[in-house]
UniProtKB/Swiss-Prot annotation:
Description of how the protein assembles with itself and partners: Interacts with the RNAP. Has a higher affinity for the core RNAP than for the holoenzyme. Its ATPase activity is stimulated by binding to RNAP.
Key word ATP-binding present: yes
Function: Transcription regulator that activates transcription by stimulating RNA polymerase (RNAP) recycling in case of stress conditions such as supercoiled DNA or high salt concentrations. Probably acts by releasing the RNAP, when it is trapped or immobilized on tightly supercoiled DNA. Does not activate transcription on linear DNA. Probably not involved in DNA repair.
Designated name of the protein: RNA polymerase-associated protein RapA
InterPro entries: Helicase_ATP-bd (IPR014001), Helicase_C-like (IPR001650), Helicase_RapA (IPR023949), P-loop_NTPase (IPR027417), RapA_C (IPR022737), SNF2-like_sf (IPR038718), SNF2/RAD54-like_C (IPR049730), SNF2_N (IPR000330)
SUPFAM superfamilies: P-loop containing nucleoside triphosphate hydrolases
Sequence similarity: Belongs to the SNF2/RAD54 helicase family. RapA subfamily.
Residues at which ATP binds: 176-183
Gene Ontology molecular-function annotations: ATP binding; DNA binding; helicase activity; hydrolase activity, acting on acid anhydrides
Domain annotation Helicase ATP-binding: ranges: 163-333
EC numbers, comma separated: 3.6.4.-
GO terms classed as biological process: regulation of DNA-templated transcription
Amino acid sequence: MPFTLGQRWISDTESELGLGTVVAIDARMVTLLFPACGENRLYSRHDAPITRVMFNVGDTVTSHEGWKLAIDNVVEDNGLLIYHGVRLDTEEPAQLREVFLDNKLTFNKPQDRLFAGQIDRMDRFALRYRARKFMSEQFKQAQSGLRGIRASLIPHQLYIANEVGKRHNPRVLLADEVGLGKTIEAGMIIHQQIMDGRAERVLIIVPESLQHQWLVEMLRRFNLRFSLFDDSRYSESLLDSDNPFETEQMIICSLDFVRKNKQRFEHLVEATWDMLVVDEAHHLVWSEKAPSREYQVIETLAEAIPSVLLLTATPEQLGQESHFARLRLLDPNRFHDYNEFINEQQKYRPVADAVTILLSEDDLNNEQQNSISEMISEQDIEPLLKASNTQGEERTKSRQALIHMLMDRHGTGRLLFRNTRSGVKGFPNRLLHAIKMPLPTQYQTAIKVAEIMAAKKSLEVRAKEMLYPERIYQEFEGENATWWNFDPRVEWLLGFLTANRHEKVLVICAQAATALQLEQVLREREGIRAAVFHEGMSLLERDRAAAYFASEEEGAQVLLCSEIGSEGRNFQFANQLVMFDLPFNPDLLEQRIGRLDRIGQNRDIDISVPYLEGTAQSVLLRWYHEGLDAFEHTCPTGRTIYDNEYDALVNYLAQPNELGDFDKFIVSCRKQHDEMKLKLEQGRDRLLEMHSNGGEVGVELANKIAEQDNDPDLVNFALNLFDIVGINQEDRSDSLIVLTPSDHMLVPDFPGLPQDGCTITFDREHALSREDTQFISWEHPIIRNGLDLVLSGDTGSCAVSLLKNKALPVGTLLVELIYVVEAQAPKHLHLTRFLPATPVRLLLDLKGNNLASQVEFESFNRQLNAVNRHTSSKLVNAVQNEVHHVLKASESLMEAEAKTLIEQAKQEADNALTHELSRLEALRAVNPNIRDDEVEAIENERTHILNHLDEATWRLDAIRLIVVTHQ
């Protein structure tokens, strides 16, 4: 094409320069000025990587003054184009010479980019289409928000998360027993609410000792990056913001941090939150006349925040008043009077009894049938009652139907979820091995001196000190005193590890210093490979230590953990636990054992406790084992008895040589424990457990998600994405890949990929066994960010390919069009479950015939060959008119396709939301726990979703020209 001064061209390789203007021409070279960035480029007149910018009738262009022109005629004058049309701002006729076009003009529409020569690679076009297709499919998946969790697929957890996570502003109490995964359930609910757009700002309030555990769990299991707020972080943020809590979207802080400072609390309340999560909610003390400050703090927040999750392991039978107080936080209108609550709870007793009868093998007698009929009086259940006394499948189905109806009437079933170990199978036995050892003379001397000097110390401080004689010894002999040279526990540990070379052993001690000193001794004395885990390490260092311990071949035999360092980490692959010392309270003891005693533990757990005779350790060991049975069984009564008997226990620990009535004390504690445990068992709410367990629904959920694990489409797409984005991949093993950033990535900083890289796997079990490995699913940030990177920009939006096919004439033109049907709506409506951005593929010949249904994308794509950009531009210029004709013809086809998709989405939304509304209204008639705002929310949601679907539109997302060749 001949060059003329003033013509506008665009660079094929540097599109960011904007529109160029021809400012100089000689026999061999042409100079372009790019006014938008003030740069010149010198090109050869032959084969220059530039494309002439020419607009067509129907296009809208912008002048350098900012006004827009709708083109209705194009005139050429001495090689320069003049565009005639109507100004959009004044609606008057106007003309615009090409030299006055906006210098910053960019080409966003795929066809504009194609005609402007900004043609992309063929593999990127294919990636874009796959990204559209897979993203659309993922939004429609029923298990959205649950599949990407880095956790085992445990039915009762999935059931609770699915049941609660889909609700509008859920307000529930998660009260599973210790070890059943309340934190994971809460994390799954948060993850779902965030993914569905129902929540963005989340506040988690926990005891100070659990902050890091939550931080680790949220990041490692759900890829949720929370910020930890303490005094220093708050003060630091106060310099940049009037309200520090508005500087982050997701925050974890301690209850003490909130309670201690009035200004801080006010800032917390003023910040707008979508969800509040409170762990260890049983510590919120309440009475009708004198609620505690902690309770009042959470109450104020719960009133202001629409969604609330409370977590507690304390059963309601151990304190009906505190149980009522927790329910009151969730729904103060419903739970406003304690006495009324007690009366109401008693009314539900017959409902639970009826379920127990239906679960038994016995036939229902007349009295029992009449009782159930009265409870479900608004429906005719006579046929179901008759069928329940028959045999076979009919009996089972009818009983299940009756149980389901009774569950709908359950008092707090919708707000409260509680699973017990007796109701959930899959837990190992716990076996205690207590090893008594003589107290070394060095310790005896140090303890005597400590007792003399501790006269002014409180009993509590003395009791805690007495548990750790090595620390007492070092206080007097100096930090470098080598207590490990004479402490018999060290010799025992060396022998134990040597005798169990093939076992992974977790050793927990109270202090980080003890763990570090033990590692040195094991390494120097016996060459035992040990990893250390303590609170002074970063998350990355802890991950590496955990991975070193988990590794089968070259890994550590033993992991030495401090109390705080081990929080939030579970090591089910090990079954040997050594407690080098004992923690001060039963909650911490259970937390230690809980590192191994989880669902998924396949072997019995051996708990070895080497203890020194005549010390506070021996006192505490007896109390835990004989008084609470806390080693070999979970101990739901432990905290209550600990609080009741605290003063006496501290007294015995502070003076272990003056035990006096200690045997009676042990008997008394065991009696309390047995009585409470019996009360718990008798008061077990089978109906609530059935409701919380999820039964077959939970199992089905787990199976469906398991079927989607290791999805070959995901693996192929992810590897293709990494290649095209420019991420380095190195195979570490059959299932592990190391990803690292490269210097030639599509973006300099790929979101979700650390600067020093990361190890990934598509296999859930591998991810669970290695702390340093990320589990890649469609929900992982690396994949989600990759999809966004491709689809939010122009990557792959236009391409040109050659098709070698001798059955077709040379030069035959096919146009492949990817349209997208979509609707815009606020995130919280979660419109994508009915109409995600849905790709529609058309493959048109010049006659307007659509061949897409006969020619599948992947097999067709494999037959095509790439074309370099310069040749592509020439081909496009040669067939520009034909392509315009095909685009015009495609619109009527697309109109019909879009109409069908939108109608289907409206029908699906109407059916789903009407069904949900009917279900809630029917439940509200028999169960007062259905909040009015839930029903109203569904009604509003239905109206808004149908309105937004009415406004759904379609647009061209990508275009590819295919030219037939025989070469």
